[in-house]
Amino acid sequence: MAPPKAASHRPAVRRKKSGTLVDSILDKYLNVRFFKYLLLEPAALPIVGLFVLLAELVINVVVIQRVPYTEIDWVAYMQECEGFLNGTTNYSLLRGDTGPLVYPAAFVYIYSALYYVTSHGTNVRLAQYIFAGIYLLQLALVLRLYSKSRKVPPYVLVLSAFTSYRIHSIYVLRLFNDPVAVLLLYAALNLFLDRRWTLGSTFFSLAVGVKMNILLFAPALLLFYLANLGLLRTILQLAVCGVIQLLLGAPFLLTHPVEYLRGSFDLGRIFEHKWTVNYRFLSRDVFENRTFHVSLLGLHLLLLLAFAKPIWTFFQSYVRLRRIEDQLQPQITQQNLQLKAQKRPKKVEKDKDKDQKKFTTEQQSFLKAFEKSLQKASGGKATPAPAQAEPERYGIHFDRCTQLALLPFFLCNLVGVACSRSLHYQFYVWYFHSLPYLAWSTPYSLGVRCLILGLIEYCWNTYPSTNFSSAALHFTHIILLAGVAKQLIQTMRINNAAKREQQEQQKKLQ
């Protein structure tokens, strides 16, 4: 990679020599080029994200005020928590109108707090606004990840957020516990990418304590731990997750441990066929057949094994780039300080600075390979550096390497969703916010990517599910997985070619 490019990515706009400040602002921002930048350039997502959050605030308020609330599980949640608050710690005795309590202890504590805040669960409108806050907070965390990765154009996220009726319904009209678990999960992902490991492990374990579907991310997290921390520190983080589960479950484990484990972590629970979104075309007998369940579990494990090597390679590349960032960032900071301190240094000082601050050949080749691989993986073209232009400041957007971390996490979750024994409508939040990222991680055309997202939205909005909607959902999952797999193979080839090129350059230097 050539010396770092200027950090600014906004389109250049000619400025008038004279005029008021207002004229200057209008000339700079109220033009077609700037609007195209906001819609198409991933680097503009932090700006666009603010408008998305403000618009979503209005949308959620309108939905709460105008669309009737639908009671499904809220009353049952309150009944289950009321039993706990009355002193019952036997999970087999904690029940609601829809059946026994089947969620871990963190769910009980969170919804017990909501029980008190909402006047024993009677103030549903207040609960709806609390869940609107959960929605906005989670969306902010999701947008932060997308902003770091710079992979998906802003207009895709805008359309995805504004057009999903089902997602808004799940959050503010149904009050399910799935949004709470997913919120904690995205908080954990943000913390992991900030390298705040113990806090991230804490939030991940809390998410599992709300609902077990978060364990679908666990295979990727285990490899991420190992790649970043090594074996001993990985064991420490796993211990953090385990201790939190023990602390959360202590009131139940110390009194009725078997009932707690059987009730909250029941992997063999049979789902009702009438609520399935993905297997409507199967008969009830096949749907509830144990052999069918074991077959899906086997397929899940086989897919995880098939993706294990590229996932591990992605994580290793991510770790190497973070180490390069740690090496180069002090140099970049020093160069920016020098540029700020003096506009035109003397020639002697220039030569001295070049000798001291010049990136090593290994660093340059590694960064060049990284930039090339990410550009090809995202389908983008290299941005030519302006010839003989003196940058205002140096900068390398190292956070773009989060692409190497996010895709494996989202992919593992998608595999789990695709192989699920049954999907209910509220389960859409498990992977909804990762779908644009996954679609843009395929080599498909823009039209095919949008078609995939549109079909998935159609399937989840079809109520009750039909044979066609269930089959279409499986079809889109398969197409999406196949596209991601193809892109992974291409990226692996690019990575291997970059390694060979780097090795050849090192041999020449020797």
From Swiss-Prot:
Residues 348-358 have a biased composition (Basic and acidic residues). Residues 65-97, 147-171, 233, 316-403, 448-464 are lumenal. The chain crosses the membrane at residues 44-64, 98-118, 126-146, 172-192, 212-232, 234-254, 295-315, 404-424, 427-447, 465-485. It is found in: Endoplasmic reticulum membrane. One of its GO terms (cellular component) is endoplasmic reticulum. Induction: Down-regulated by bacterial infection in the gut. Disruption phenotype: Pupal lethal. Pupation is delayed by up to 11 days resulting in giant 3rd instar larvae. Imaginal disc cell proliferation is slowed resulting in smaller imaginal discs with aberrant architecture compared to wild type larvae of the same age, however, during delayed pupation imaginal disc cells continue to proliferate unchecked resulting in imaginal disc tumors. RNAi-mediated knockdown in gut progenitor cells results in increased intestinal stem cell mitotic proliferation. Keywords: Developmental protein, Endoplasmic reticulum, Glycosyltransferase, Membrane, Transferase, Transmembrane, Transmembrane helix, Tumor suppressor. InterPro entries: Glycosyltransferase_ALG3. The keyword Transmembrane helix applies. Residues 1-43, 119-125, 193-211, 255-294, 425-426, 486-510 are cytoplasmic. Changing H433R: In tid4 mutant. Pathway: Protein modification; protein glycosylation. Residues 337-358 are annotated as: Disordered. It is an enzyme of class 2 (transferase). Pfam families: ALG3. It catalyses: an alpha-D-Man-(1->2)-alpha-D-Man-(1->2)-alpha-D-Man-(1->3)-[alpha-D-Man-(1->6)]-beta-D-Man-(1->4)-beta-D-GlcNAc-(1->4)-alpha-D-GlcNAc-diphospho-di-trans,poly-cis-dolichol + a di-trans,poly-cis-dolichyl beta-D-mannosyl phosphate = an alpha-D-Man-(1->2)-alpha-D-Man-(1->2)-alpha-D-Man-(1->3)-[alpha-D-Man-(1->3)-alpha-D-Man-(1->6)]-beta-D-Man-(1->4)-beta-D-GlcNAc-(1->4)-alpha-D-GlcNAc-diphospho-di-trans,poly-cis-dolichol + a di-trans,poly-cis-dolichyl phosphate + H(+). Its EC number is 2.4.1.258. GO terms for molecular function: dol-P-Man:Man(5)GlcNAc(2)-PP-Dol alpha-1,3-mannosyltransferase activity. It is a multi-pass membrane protein. Changing T333A: In strain: Berkeley, bIf and Apxo. One of its GO terms (biological process) is protein glycosylation. In strains Harvich and Apxo, there are 2 genes which code for l(2)not/Alg3 protein. They differ in their C-terminus. Probable alpha-1,3-mannosyltransferase involved in the N-glycosylation pathway. Involved in glycosylation of the TNF receptor grnd, regulating its ligand affinity. Required for normal epithelial growth and architecture. Suppressor of JNK-dependent intestinal stem cell proliferation. Belongs to the glycosyltransferase ALG3 family. This is Dolichyl-P-Man:Man5GlcNAc2-PP-dolichol alpha-1,3-mannosyltransferase Alg3. It comes from Drosophila melanogaster. The gene is Alg3.
